[in-house]
């Protein structure tokens, strides 16, 4: 089996905390130097590389003299602020040895949820790649809360892959890849060499927590691969402990688990909607509406809405949830939550009599709706 990385030109490489730190005692300068050398080798082959790197909080902990990762959000943010300085400095120093410029980009999920900021981030990253710069990306943990508490850089890597239409996402971890069961508990567990991204059985196989320094277990990596497939990006999950793992993957050697994007690439606008990690509200729709959306490719009409939850404005992305509580779609709503509460369960012909006006006959037009 040949590695999919060999034929991939634009790569997003995610490196976990345990691969750039000395077991929590600050940054491992030698390890970062090796990553810089490998990325320089890939660049020499004509590949474009965006690096998503963890390590800021771990570095901040070391600089502040903390031996355990704090639980309080304000302390995590303080550690991130202190550590981000060191992380950027070390990467810049190591890449300069290969005559490569770097750029620091700190993102939040809110940056990618806003359409204008999303497009600006995309334009900036593509310009940096065109200029031969290696963008080094991390979540802006200093100003966010939910991302520190629940987020992970695996997801961020997938979002970046979608943002720049990357060919592949490489998630480097301290594990060898995805196994059929937890190899620490089951001696019969075997490595999954290749599978389809988004295959339901993968989530059942994945489990277990990540290291104490990082936040992402194997499940987050599987879900990141599923998300990256939205833009047609394949994913490789491999051990960063393997010598020259990036160079060997680029040479075609099969290492770890590769997850292939089999689904059709989403249109850019629909991809942006699908990549919303948080939505302001959702509508519960009946079984008939679920069928029309999923099988018929129809628009969502107010009559198909059972309930309205959350507060949202016209033009925002909302989720569509079936009677069983499962999200089936999301899209840009033509009406606010207050308006939707007045017109739900009503035929489109009655919208004007209820509201005094009719903006659109659909709550969400099919052109602004994406299945999830």
Curated annotation (Swiss-Prot):
Protein name listed in UniProt: Glutamate 5-kinase
Any GO molecular function: RNA binding
PANTHER family (UniProt xref): GLUTAMATE 5-KINASE, ISOPENTENYL PHOSPHATE KINASE
Membership in a protein family: Belongs to the glutamate 5-kinase family.
Organism for this UniProt entry: Burkholderia lata (strain ATCC 17760 / DSM 23089 / LMG 22485 / NCIMB 9086 / R18194 / 383)
Family annotation (PROSITE patterns): GLUTAMATE_5_KINASE (PS00902), PUA (PS50890)
Its job: Catalyzes the transfer of a phosphate group to glutamate to form L-glutamate 5-phosphate.
Gene: proB
Catalytic activity: L-glutamate + ATP = L-glutamyl 5-phosphate + ADP
